[in-house]
């Protein structure tokens, strides 16, 4: 059975309404199917990844951004060392679909 390497996520900032998650991952890391309970914005700081959302593959690279709707299942496959900030409301949670 293949071991899945997930990107690391840490909260770097938290304000009155929003928080910023730092997401980092090595080439080949994958974030399995999950949702955010509220809308989220991904801003790529470094690297490349493929966001699979609504049946489409969205190629993300440095300086790209994407808006992920609330409760929309999606995955992230990292193609090159990856760093991104994800901005979401403080009470938003990431929930994996098949943990």
Predicted regions span which residues?
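A short glycine-rich, His/Asp/Glu-containing loop-to-beta-strand
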Residues: 1-29
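A cytosolic small-molecule/anion-sensing beta-strand core signal
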Residues: 45-46, 61-62, 80
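Ligand-binding loop in jelly-roll beta-barrel domains
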Residues: 70-94
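Short acidic-glycine-tyrosine-enriched beta hairpin
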Residues: 55-70
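Short histidine-centered beta-strand/loop micro-motifs
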Residues: 11-13, 22, 30-36, 77-78, ...
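Short, conserved beta-strand element in jelly-roll/cupin
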Residues: 36-50
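Short strand-coil-strand connectors
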Residues: 52-56, 79
